[in-house]
Each structure stands twice: as structure tokens, then as C-alpha cells.
């Protein structure tokens, strides 16, 4: 579970909710496009770890995918099932889902989760757990904010200065290095590939979001794939 969010922060005072929503929907479309193009699986069993209120059904739609939503807060998992956004709910924390048997999923999804986990401890247990839970040929899918993007770098500076709550409302938004995450996935026995989801930022005016977002089509290009504001890691267990 992430830390308590403080709505009275600098960035939210300056941001228009409609602007935030526009980029959120644009980002979801881009996530869906990337996963459809690169996952290489048409359906199966999927686990959304740290599902929160949005377990990622837009990425893993019915009827092709059976989606299990797991969260340390059981109410969030129940909410996902009640809304039809998941087929089953499970209480449990990332890296501690020992109740689930080995090789029981084709996809393990961490959507905007690992950068919160990184605040509390190392990511290696989550990656090792993903490999254990995956069937041969299955994939860990992680979508995270990027330390190498200017916004991520600025956020990291604010966090180091102890200003995270004042600036963006929570201390546990920890932008991740895509290179380090890919290396950690490889060390866990997975085969990683990486794509930039979007170069844009939800706090920008909508017109600027569109202009910067035009670069997203280059998000799988060598070199540029490392520099998105958010990135997608697809890390496969060998078949």
C-alpha cells in the first residue's frame, strides 16, 4: 500500500483536473497499444499486484483474460471485482504472495506499483516472485515513472530534499531507473525489453501534452526508449 496522499500540495494546487484526466486517458491508450504490439500473448491468466482502485483491465480485457486483483487493502481488491474490473480478488502485498502456486499466471502486472515499493525496500523480492508465478513464456509487465526523464529527475531531487509531500503530496513516489530495473529483472531470470509509454506529463496544458506526446511513436526506438516520462518493462520467463 502506498503512503497517505496529501491533496494540499504544490503541484495539485496548480493543476487542472481536466488536464490531468486528458493525459491519463492518453496514457492508457498508449499502454494498451504497446502491450498489444509487444506482449505476444492473446489471452490467459493474469495477476494485477498492488491493484489499487484500477487493476489494469484496459490492458487485459475480458473474455480473453482472467484477471486476479491483489492488494494489501482487501477493500480495493473487492472493489475491483464488484466493478467488473477483475474476476477474482486477493488480499496480499507485492513480494509476499506466497499463497499463490508456482507457474499459475501468464502475466504478472505491476502498474504504477514498483515505484511505491521502492520507497519501503528493494524490488528484488517482487521480481523473484513474478518469475515464480509466471508460466514458461509468460511475462512480467511493469509501468513506472522514469528517473531519466526531466520530471522524474526533478521529483527525485524534491524527494532527497525532504519536499516530496509539499511538492506532490506523498513521500513514496520514487522514479525508477529503467536500466536498473531491466538489469534486476534479468538477474531474476527474466528476459527484459523496454518501451517508453509517453514523453509527456499530465501537468502540462492539453495542447502541450499533445505536442510532446507526438514523440511517443518513437518510444520503442533504441536510445529513445529509455527516456520516456513513463516506461513499460516487459520481462519474459523463457519458454
Positions of predicted regions on the chain:
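Conserved class I S-adenosyl-L-methionine
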Residues: 1-41, 141-163
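Class I SAM-dependent methyltransferase SAM/SAH-binding core
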Residues: 47-48, 52-97
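A short acidic, Gly/Pro-enriched loop at the edge of an enzyme's catalytic core
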Residues: 95-108
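A short beta-strand submotif of the Rossmann-like class I SAM-dependent methyltransferase core
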Residues: 110-114
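A short glycine-rich, Lys/Arg-flanked "PGG" loop and its adjoining helix->strand segment in the class I
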Residues: 124-136
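A C-terminal cap/extension of S-adenosyl-L-methionine-dependent methyltransferases
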Residues: 159, 192-239
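Acceptor-substrate binding/catalytic loop of class I
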Residues: 164-180
